[in-house]
């Protein structure tokens, strides 16, 4: 049947065209191209290999490939938790002139909450499917510490934090206003996302679907830290932050629509402004 043929052609496409596997220091290491761009987005790489997790126990080579993606993602986070896309090595790239703290290992440095959530989702599901906890080593612990620090900085309770981004461009959605800080927010417990999963700049910086993704991802991280690492203090930090963001979402992320009643806004700023829309890529309101 044509549908079977379509599946046979499409399902292995990521393996055939974007996955680059090697071992580094004796451990699996997988660099995943995002489409035709020779760079690895944390979000896209996590989504591209996601369908293969269910088959990991049936194919040892596939399992090693997945382990390599997860290990590579942890390394990337520890290079720079604010970056969304990375090079295969310190080779520089097209966006080195962006006005932000660029490094040669980075392809792009757009701060997007979901970039730190997709690796947690992938690692958690891999662990649940395979029972392999070897990935949760010191690199993992450091990645979690960096994720927590970054999320807390971008709650902006103690100033605007270290992240700024500007690009010389004719496209407004590829840069941030307000001297690279983006629109002001009221620090109510939500996390700022300077850019959306589409890589477009947010209008109001509390991106609601991505804050929900942060809540679920932090809870998954806490479970791993408790069960595997026995690191209850770090797990509690994850749980506490998840609860704080979840509470803030209930209070600030909804809008009383005159026709549809209570709905979630796509973006808010904590001052009472709401952006009612949705955007391509996941997480989105529709995808929730």
Which residue stretches match the model-derived regions?
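Amphipathic, well-ordered alpha-helical segments in soluble domains
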Residues: 10-17, 44, 51, 115-122, ...
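Active-site-flanking structural segment that lines cofactor/substrate pockets
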Residues: 7-43
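Active-site-adjacent bridging/hinge elements
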Residues: 15-28, 91-99, 184-196
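Aromatic-rich carbohydrate-recognition surfaces in CAZymes
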Residues: 38-66, 70-173
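Extended ligand-binding clefts on enzyme/binding-domain cores
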Residues: 42, 78-82, 86-89, 104, ...
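Generic, well-ordered alpha-helical scaffold segments in large soluble proteins
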Residues: 10, 51, 68, 72, ...
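Inter-helical turn/loop segments and adjacent helix faces that build the functional surface
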Residues: 55-60, 126-142, 201-205, 220-240
């Amino acid at each position: 049947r044509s549908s079977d043929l379509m599946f046979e052609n499409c399902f292995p496409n990521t393996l055939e065209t974007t996955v680059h596997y090697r071992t580094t220091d004796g451990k699996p290491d997988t660099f995943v191209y995002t489409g035709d761009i020779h760079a690895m987005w944390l979000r896209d790489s996590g989504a591209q290999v996601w369908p293969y997790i269910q088959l990991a126990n049936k194919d040892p080579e596939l399992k090693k490939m997945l382990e390599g993606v997860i290990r590579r993602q942890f390394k990337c986070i520890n290079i720079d938790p604010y970056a969304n896309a990375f090079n295969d090595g310190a080779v520089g790239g097209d966006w080195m002139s962006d006005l932000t703290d660029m490094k040669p290992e980075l392809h792009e440095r757009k701060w997007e909450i979901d970039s730190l959530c997709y690796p947690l989702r992938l690692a958690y599901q891999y662990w649940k499917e395979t029972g392999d906890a070897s990935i949760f080593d010191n690199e993992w612990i450091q990645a979690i510490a960096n994720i927590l620090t970054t999320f807390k900085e971008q709650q902006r309770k103690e100033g605007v934090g270290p992240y700024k981004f500007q690009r010389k461009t004719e496209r407004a959605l590829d840069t941030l206003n307000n001297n690279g800080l983006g629109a002001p927010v009221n620090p109510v417990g939500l996390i700022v996302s300077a850019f959306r999963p589409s890589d477009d700049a947010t209008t109001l910086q509390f991106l609601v679907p991505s804050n929900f993704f942060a809540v679920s991802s932090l809870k998954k991280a806490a479970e791993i830290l408790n069960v595997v690492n026995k690191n209850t203090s770090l797990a509690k930090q994850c749980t506490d932050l998840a609860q704080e963001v979840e509470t803030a979402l209930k209070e600030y992320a909804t809008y009383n629509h005159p026709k549809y009643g209570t709905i979630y806004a796509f973006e808010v700023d904590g001052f009472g402004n709401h952006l009612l829309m949705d955007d391509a890529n996941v997480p989105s309101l529709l995808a929730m």
